Amino acid sequence: QAKLDVVILEVGLGGRLDATNIVDNDMAVITSIDIDHTDFLGSTRDQIGFEKAGIFRANKLVIIGEPNIPQSMLAHAETLGCQLFCRHLDWHFCQQEQSWTWQTTRKDEKVRWNLLADLPLCQIPLANAATALAAVQKLPFEISLETVKKSLLEVELTGRFQTMKPASLTHLAQMVQREVEALPRMIIDVGHNPHAARYLAEKLTALKAKSQGKVIAVCGILKDKDAIGVLTPLLPLVDEWCCVTLGGYRGQHGEDLFVTLQQVATQQHLSVQGSYLDS
């Protein structure tokens, strides 16, 4: 009805049975594959890969940013005759200290740019940015390099390593600069699987290399999530854990999370609070 030039649909869960899959797409994009939502998608990467491959369409483009592609996904793409454009096989990226580079691995690849150097670092996982850039390379209309670089500088994802100001500090504007700088940095991240936890650990590692002080984690996890898998990458980086209760029927009680943490966090201080507001 709106006669849009481009429609981007984000799959909510899996792909094959997701509501967004009623739309026939011209291009399917897979960012990553990890163990999550096992009650619905299966307990192995091969099962989950097949479910995600459900968004593929016959003879259409498929962009894959996952470096370790499950065989089930490749087999489904072959059955449908999809045009694959995959990380490592067809393109790759490399991060430098202040920038990054995107490049095709085959000189005969039909893309807009075979090599993009000195790209600005961005606030989202670089693998995701590189996958999005791979999709841009295959779009049937022009996008300028200036637009690409501007977008990389401006892109952000709410709730992913997001720095927050304490809501109670309504007088922040009246505070002198040294008082503001003395406030603890508050970072929120809604990652809920091991893959997201590993990315958070990378960000915390980089932050701790530049800053001094303790890392206090206020943590709540749903009952159906892999708590050990999420917590383990963060253990070397967190000094204190505060376990909180999440609401809803899937919410895990802080006391239960505390017991789980005791199994793996043997060196850190642990505590329990009723909610994140209490903490």
Question: Where are the regions a protein language model picked out?
Answer:
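Short loop-to-beta-strand entry elements in the cores of soluble alpha/beta enzymes
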Residues: 56-64
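Nucleotide-sugar donor phosphate/pyrophosphate-binding loop at the beta->alpha transition
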Residues: 42-50
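Membrane-proximal helix-turn-helix segments that form the acceptor-binding/catalytic region
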Residues: 49-57
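Nucleotide phosphate-binding/pyrophosphate-handling subdomain across enzymes
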Residues: 5-9, 19-29, 33-37, 47, ...
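Short regulatory helix/loop adjacent to the ATP-binding pocket of P-loop NTPases
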Residues: 45, 72-73
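C-terminal helical cap/extension that packs against the catalytic core
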Residues: 63, 67-72, 78-81, 85, ...
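Short, acidic/turn-prone active-site loops that include or flank metal/cofactor-
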Residues: 33-36, 89-91, 220-222, 245-250
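Extended acidic/charged loop-beta regions that coordinate divalent cations
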Residues: 2-40, 74-114
